[in-house]
Amino acid sequence: MHVIKRDGRQERVMFDKITSRIQKLCYGLNMDFVDPAQITMKVIQGLYSGVTTVELDTLAAETAATLTTKHPDYAILAARIAVSNLHKETKKVFSDVMEDLYNYINPHNGKHSPMVAKSTLDIVLANKDRLNSAIIYDRDFSYNYFGFKTLERSYLLKINGKVAERPQHMLMRVSVGIHKEDIDAAIETYNLLSERWFTHASPTLFNAGTNRPQLSSCFLLSMKDDSIEGIYDTLKQCALISKSAGGIGVAVSCIRATGSYIAGTNGNSNGLVPMLRVYNNTARYVDQGGNKRPGAFAIYLEPWHLDIFEFLDLKKNTGKEEQRARDLFFALWIPDLFMKRVETNQDWSLMCPNECPGLDEVWGEEFEKLYASYEKQGRVRKVVKAQQLWYAIIESQTETGTPYMLYKDSCNRKSNQQNLGTIKCSNLCTEIVEYTSKDEVAVCNLASLALNMYVTSEHTYDFKKLAEVTKVVVRNLNKIIDINYYPVPEACLSNKRHRPIGIGVQGLADAFILMRYPFESAEAQLLNKQIFETIYYGALEASCDLAKEQGPYETYEGSPVSKGILQYDMWNVTPTDLWDWKVLKEKIAKYGIRNSLLIAPMPTASTAQILGNNESIEPYTSNIYTRRVLSGEFQIVNPHLLKDLTERGLWHEEMKNQIIACNGSIQSIPEIPDDLKQLYKTVWEISQKTVLKMAAERGAFIDQSQSLNIHIAEPNYGKLTSMHFYGWKQGLKTGMYYLRTRPAANPIQFTLNKEKLKDKEKVSKEEEEKERNTAAMVCSLENRDECLMCGS
């Protein structure tokens, strides 16, 4: 059997040569568990005569990846094989690679189609010695296999389908793309990115340094007008933004309801549903940047709108197709008045914005007065029990995980943009809360700090380093506002006037584990607070320094910060004594700040996978999980747990099988000691009340909002109701992003049992269930404290 080498020569397949190549990449790994010869044996079984060395390396990497559940070092080895393969297939010198990307000729039409901007190439060539020598290629070897494969699939630029960039090239491209001629700043950013202290968001990594640097993740729109022109102008904006790879939040509360009079045609409106189906089809048609991600629109509606019940059904799995829009995402923008009326079991009036105008333009007391005046004037279209609508909301969430829950009054009352007007919606992921109008499309550029990195070897937390890196991130995101490509002019106008940014986090759960703090412990709760105090402090200080150089943002005057009111003041919270807030407030009073908003913990799904961290602010959902790559699915064990079990001599095949059998939980495995059971509780074993409490405690230092998922293994209407009311009373802006559940029953058994039921029995069962759910919901409203104790 022979192998074809990269230069075209043929050579006999030699077992020892393959083993030796793998052995060389095993430095620093735990050789008690990693066995290069075992990988070689498996590789040789899959070979055929005429295999190329590239295919051989790919097979070796995949083989190592399949052994990851034996030990996480196999994932590192798999990545090293794959990275070493990529290094052999790509040019080393950064400036050469950038020239190749610029000189690209499209094979379909023979035209010059540069993949990087001429301005980026010119800067690289003018500074090539410094930039080329600053790159440290060994850092490519620190990715695990699944992080590297994610980069390879979607992030590294390709020439004719073949990857041309190495990960380090991409990070330097991004750094130069942001900082242009400021080479010192570019190299500083490159080092922080490549050492994994933080990461920019996916659109920034995709597009920085290219001809169309659309670096923003989030866009928020409100309807231009309740008219055919307004609806379709807004739709066009959505299409243009989605084409450029932006996720979208759209406020639709101003659109007239079903049956409302249309003066221009002397007809009646069809309401929200047919309009949203048009938006649904646009989302399907226009994906985010050529198949990178599907188009994604979140639709925000206030619960007084007459079409609210139909809105809650739009994502359901059953029902008439023409009453569904399953490719959209749905969110409620909830005034406090609705929550109060649900709590006290009062009536709730549904209205049409055409007949009761302005409700979406006011919040708080002003909203309550206007709403009550419309009720008094008899302009109401329908009256329902507030709890009847609440039941429909809970029912939809139990079935579909949505709508998202955001509290309109908290979002406005605690916003530094409240001087601009009423904020009408959030974004696709519920962490961005920014002002929109018919002339302004809100935008946010994102980055996330890898919180696990700031845990020292002595198990202390390096707040000083966290503040320093936060300041670099602020400067980067602030620069992006000026160099960004905007898909619509209204986005450019908004972003340059208010200059908001969104700094998030990833690896909070990893940081707790490295500090040896169980997620619910008092120590973790204090660290959670101090991490966000530090990020907010560092971000404000950096933004103030920028204002000193460049002046405050255009609409600064009249904002809460301009009056000395910071986010924690709006929550009536006193920070810990970690930082000197008095000095910072004095500095801000003198110079102002450059950015209206700063902090917004987002989901971090893709970038956390690249860096090998747990997502965002989330606890671990399981201690064993599946990672999908193009070549298949791989099971991964939580690497921290595996390290702990290995050190205590408890890691073996049988242990792995027990964890899999327990769905990733270790709580019922007798051999595992209690201290590890506390440390490795999954989200299903952590009190959701604690999760909400920690969200509120960090919320005092988050001037936008946070993507906060609620996990209830088997939700009932009582549990869910008490969760929502607890979050609302804690003052959260986002009460819930997704409701994550686990199926309670085996669906096959469930189907079989259902089949046997007669229609009559089925109807009575459904009625019984509705009664039971209503009773649970009402019980939780009447006995909130007790209900939370028995809930999650």
From Swiss-Prot:
The gene coding this protein: RRM1
Location in or out of the cell: Cytoplasm
Classification via PROSITE patterns: ATP_CONE (PS51161), RIBORED_LARGE (PS00089)
Chief site of localization: cytoplasm
Reaction it catalyzes: a 2'-deoxyribonucleoside 5'-diphosphate + [thioredoxin]-disulfide + H2O = a ribonucleoside 5'-diphosphate + [thioredoxin]-dithiol
Name of this protein: Ribonucleoside-diphosphate reductase large subunit
Function: Provides the precursors necessary for DNA synthesis. Catalyzes the biosynthesis of deoxyribonucleotides from the corresponding ribonucleotides.
Summary of subunit composition and partner proteins: Heterodimer of a large and a small subunit. Heterodimer with small subunit RRM2 or RRM2B. The heterodimer with RRM2 has higher catalytic activity than the heterodimer with RRM2B. Interacts with AHCYL1 which inhibits its activity.
Residue(s) at site: Important for electron transfer: Y737, Y738
Misc remark: Two distinct regulatory sites have been defined: the specificity site, which controls substrate specificity, and the activity site which regulates overall catalytic activity. A substrate-binding catalytic site, located on M1, is formed only in the presence of the second subunit M2.
Pfam entry (one): Ribonuc_red_lgN
Gene source species: Homo sapiens
CDD domains associated with the record: RNR_I (cd01679)
Regulation: Under complex allosteric control mediated by deoxynucleoside triphosphates and ATP binding to separate specificity and activation sites on the M1 subunit. The type of nucleotide bound at the specificity site determines substrate preference. It seems probable that ATP makes the enzyme reduce CDP and UDP, dGTP favors ADP reduction and dTTP favors GDP reduction. Stimulated by ATP and inhibited by dATP binding to the activity site, the dATP inhibition is mediated by AHCYL1 which stabilizes dATP in the site.
Disulfide bonds: C218-C444
Alphabetic keyword roster: Acetylation, Allosteric enzyme, ATP-binding, Cytoplasm, Deoxyribonucleotide synthesis, Disulfide bond, Nucleotide-binding, Oxidoreductase, Phosphoprotein, Primary mitochondrial disease, Progressive external ophthalmoplegia
Disorder: Progressive external ophthalmoplegia with mitochondrial DNA deletions, autosomal recessive 6: A form of progressive external ophthalmoplegia, a mitochondrial myopathy characterized by progressive paralysis of the levator palpebrae, orbicularis oculi, and extraocular muscles. Ragged red fibers are seen on muscle biopsy.
